[in-house]
Amino acid sequence: MTAAEPGSRLEWSTPPAALAAAAVGGLALAGAAVLTGDGSSRLLIGLAAALLLGLAALGVRQRPRLTIVPGAAPRLIVRGLLGPAEYPREKILRARVVGFRRLGRRVPNLELDVEHDGDDRLLIFGRWDLGTHPQDVLDAMREHGLAPRER
């Protein structure tokens, strides 16, 4: 599939089903916190509910997490908590997939070194953020000329 085909993917974000599951889990925990009789249990379950609901809200707020805008001057839009940030080709200093050890296995992450308002910034995206394998996103970035080749 090429970038010109209508089915090619140019946006990545946390899957909606995962966000819905986090929200439902948070609501279930909130209900359990209300029904429990012990004060310390109510506090701990309530905190867990707030964290899950916050995670779901954050995921919804940041959708889509990454977007490639194709064209003569392609750019990458990264949506964060405070809103979107645009990075044209010349502001993306390095892009690579790096594997980190987590819970006994290697987990791939997309690392982007970008120039943001005169400072260098490291952006790290995992499968949760992208909804797909980070290598797929890096391949799409390379296809659109947004990822400098590793030396």
Model-derived features: where do they sit?
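Cytosol-/stroma-facing membrane-proximal "stalk/adaptor" domains immediately downstream
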Residues: 142-151
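Short, ordered beta-strand-loop transition motifs
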Residues: 2-6, 69-72, 102-104
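Conserved beta-hairpin
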Residues: 53-93
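Non-transmembrane, membrane-adjacent beta-strand/coil modules in membrane-associated proteins
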Residues: 77-136, 151
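N-terminal membrane-targeting/pre-transmembrane regions
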Residues: 1-39, 119
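Low-complexity, S/T/G/P-rich flexible repeat/linker segments used as non-globular hinges
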Residues: 138-140
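Hydrophobic alpha-helical transmembrane segments
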Residues: 37-50
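Core hydrophobic alpha-helical transmembrane segments of single-pass membrane proteins
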Residues: 26-29, 49-53
